Amino acid sequence: MNASSERDRSLFGVLRQFRRSFWSVGIFSAVINVLMLAPSVYMLQVYDRVLASGNGITLLMLTLLMAGLCAFMGALEWVRSLLVVRLGTRIDLALNQDVFNAAFARNLEAGDGRAGLALTDLTLLRQFITGNALFAFFDVPWFPLFLLVLFLLHPWLGMLALGGTVVPGGVGLAEPASDQSTAGGSNQQSQQATHLADAQLRNADVIEAMGMLGNLRRRWLARHYRFISLQNLASERAAAVGGASKYSRIALQSLMLGLGALLAIDGKITPGMMIAGSILVGRVLSPIDQLIGVWKQWSSARIAWQRLTRLIAAYPPRPAAMALPAPEGHLSVEQVSLRTAQGNTRLQNIHFSLQAGETLVILGASGSGKSSLARLLVGAQSPTQGKVRLDGADLNQVDKNTFGPTIGYLPQDVQLFKGSLAENIARFGDADPEKVVAAAKLAGVHELILSLPNGYDTELGDGGGGLSGGQRQRIGLARAMYGDPCLLILDEPNASLDSEGDQALMQAIVALQKRGATVVLITHRPALTTLAQKILILHEGQQQRMGLARDVLTELQQRSAANQARMNPTAAMPQ
């Protein structure tokens, strides 16, 4: 049995956990719908018994009974609403952790920025359950009861009601089904247009400086106009069906009164039955109208459920891993390869090992796979082949909550989070002031932080808004060093640093080496190679050279001298 089917059962199993709550909602709905017969019975008794007898006491008793039943129905509706609200919340709580983790895992692998869509789908499901849609589906099975009572009053009344529900009901339910592709396309175009605008306007400085606004706006407008066109088409169809449904209901109720009057004139039914029939046909149509009104919600909820099913099937919850002792920093890369979903090879047969406390510098041209290797070394991505081990433990199988604090990672594109500087450095855990300050001092950013208006309590915007690129990189370095990790992977750590920042970085790496931390530096600047015990050279995703730093540097110098000699042979001739 495949994982997908197992996960399908797991998602539906969440609903089965709350089957008692669904049964309770169903029972309340049954009682409410049976009590909906009370107004028709009341009118039948008033017209056929009270008016004929002129008995005011009977009218009073019937009215009091009717008032009591209405109050009881109101109480049942209130309790039913509370049940579904709590049911939706409980289902959300049962699913949100798996959905959040799966959305995070997909974003980690694909990097498509669509993690929020899964959380939106979960919200849509909760709103579907807690809204009128669920009531409609519980009420629809009871419309045959009202139809049966109409047949009991007179077969012609039942036939008219049945015919009146088939036509508008069929049209109303068929239209959303046929319009599903239009609505789905409209939503997809809207999401794409919004995502495009967010991605483009995030770089407002570049857009303004180079006059790109008009070109980018045209790209956004193309998608936006497609969204508007599809939305208008869906809205026009919905308006046509809504108008037809509304006026067919009015026409049916009028015809029911007319037919009832005709039957009453012929003496086949009483005037009370005529009025009761008019009320009952409204009850027959009401669930159908509700179902038509929420059909699009049902379609959206079904699509959201299918997306969540596929998401959690593709990224199932990780089994709880046994807690391991804190690692010392022994890093082993065993024949690691990495390929993209499209089949492109990023890395091929990378293999090396580092003892605790060693420093490795990774060199290579742009696009050689350095950053991809960095992601593998911290367990942010799983290799297609091979293993990355820290103290013998596979990084893709360990508990990240345990191993994560022992690893420091500075990506090439440093992203800080909305919150205070102290929270960012402390990785949004329980911030230990001493550890926060120690990490900041180690990264050489303590004085810079103190110069800010609120020091360590300075609030950052999304992505570290309010700081320069160099400042973000130094704060990211402090975050990587927080908690004295045993392994640090620093991807282009000096890319945005000035001379002062470079000096602080060199001092920080020396301090880490003295503490016995294993450090991996990815850089294109030769200055950092002086700190390395080993050097790895990547070329087009392959390991071109790996060895002791002095041997690799000597080989590089000899190769460079040979290349210069070939390019300028006269320089090598004796004078």
Swiss-Prot record:
Residues 22-300 form the ABC transmembrane type-1 domain. InterPro entries: AAA+_ATPase (IPR003593), ABC1_TM_dom (IPR011527), ABC1_TM_sf (IPR036640), ABC_transporter-like_ATP-bd (IPR003439), ABC_transporter-like_CS (IPR017871), ATPase_T1SS_PrtD-like (IPR010128), P-loop_NTPase (IPR027417), Type_1_exporter (IPR039421). PROSITE patterns: ABC_TM1F, ABC_TRANSPORTER_1, ABC_TRANSPORTER_2. It comes from the Bacteria. Pfam families: ABC_membrane, ABC_tran. Residues 331-565 form the ABC transporter domain. Signal peptide: none annotated. It is found in: Cell inner membrane. GO terms for cellular component: plasma membrane; type I protein secretion system complex. One of its GO terms (molecular function) is ATP binding. GO terms for biological process: protein secretion by the type I secretion system. Its main location: membrane. It is a multi-pass membrane protein. The chain crosses the membrane at residues 22-42, 56-76, 133-153, 154-174, 255-275. ATP binds at residues 364-371. Keywords: ATP-binding, Cell inner membrane, Cell membrane, Membrane, Nucleotide-binding, Transmembrane, Transmembrane helix, Transport. Involved in the secretion of proteases A, B, C and G. PANTHER family: ATP-BINDING CASSETTE SUB-FAMILY B MEMBER 10, MITOCHONDRIAL (PTHR43394:SF1), ATP-DEPENDENT PERMEASE MDL1, MITOCHONDRIAL (PTHR43394). Belongs to the ABC transporter superfamily. This is Proteases secretion ATP-binding protein PrtD. The lineage of its organism: Bacteria, Pseudomonadati, Pseudomonadota, Gammaproteobacteria, Enterobacterales. The gene is prtD.
